[in-house]
Amino acid sequence: MNPRRKKRLTLAVALIVGVSAIASLLLYALNSNLNLFFTPTEIIHGKKDTGVMPEVGQRIRVGGMVTIGSMVRDPESLHVEFAIHDISGGEIIVTYDDLLPDLFREGQGIVAQGVLSAPGVLQATEVLAKHDENYMPPEVAEAMGQTHEKLDYNQEQKSGGY
């Protein structure tokens, strides 16, 4: 092999290795920053179509209804713990260490984003509350359309009381 061909071959191999390394790093970064949406039932039993269950330590988003009577606040800090459920019977615990949204209340639909700290326990970094009767994030609407019935709120809940 003459030196010119050898140089071209070396350059081509180096280019292929470099592009492969960049593609691998890009896919790894995208995979680690991916927030998958789950319902409480899917966290417990896995997704219906694939059976995929989130792993402890994985960043996820969870949507469901706050279980009435489940909210426990720590009087010494901002720490709050509550359960969310769906109509299929799945229920998980969500812990949160910040201020809850003004529209957050029991019986309300929410989306919580965070890390699964134990099976069935989400350490939330963000909690979003549904802000009116009609709006809902698309993935929550899809999941709730399959597994939730419209709830009737009593007057105390409509006025923002717990």
From Swiss-Prot:
Membrane topology (UniProt)? Single-pass type II membrane protein
State the InterPro entries in the record: CcmE, CcmE-like_sf, NA-bd_OB-fold
Give the transmembrane ranges: 9-29
Question: Any ranges marked Periplasmic in the topology annotation, and which?
Answer: 30-162
Residues binding heme are 131, 135
Q: Which Pfam families match?
A: CcmE (PF03100)
Carries keyword Glycosyltransferase? no
User: Gene3D superfamilies attached here?
Assistant: Nucleic acid-binding proteins (2.40.50.140)
Tell me which parts of the chain lie in the Cytoplasmic compartment.
Answer: 1-8
Cellular component per GO, a single term: plasma membrane
Endpoints of the signal sequence: none
Q: What is its main location?
A: membrane
Q: What's an example of a GO molecular-function annotation for this chain?
A: metal ion binding
Cellular location(s): Cell inner membrane
Single GO biological process annotation from the record: cytochrome complex assembly
Which keywords accompany this UniProt record? Answer: Cell inner membrane, Cell membrane, Cytochrome c-type biogenesis, Heme, Iron, Membrane, Metal-binding, Signal-anchor, Transmembrane, Transmembrane helix
Alphabetized HAMAP family for the sequence: CcmE
- Role played: Heme chaperone required for the biogenesis of c-type cytochromes. Transiently binds heme delivered by CcmC and transfers the heme to apo-cytochromes in a process facilitated by CcmF and CcmH.
> Which protein family is named in the record?
Belongs to the CcmE/CycJ family.
Name listed for the protein in its UniProt record: Cytochrome c-type biogenesis protein CcmE
Q: Which organism's genome codes for this protein?
A: Shewanella halifaxensis (strain HAW-EB4)
Report which gene this protein is encoded by: ccmE
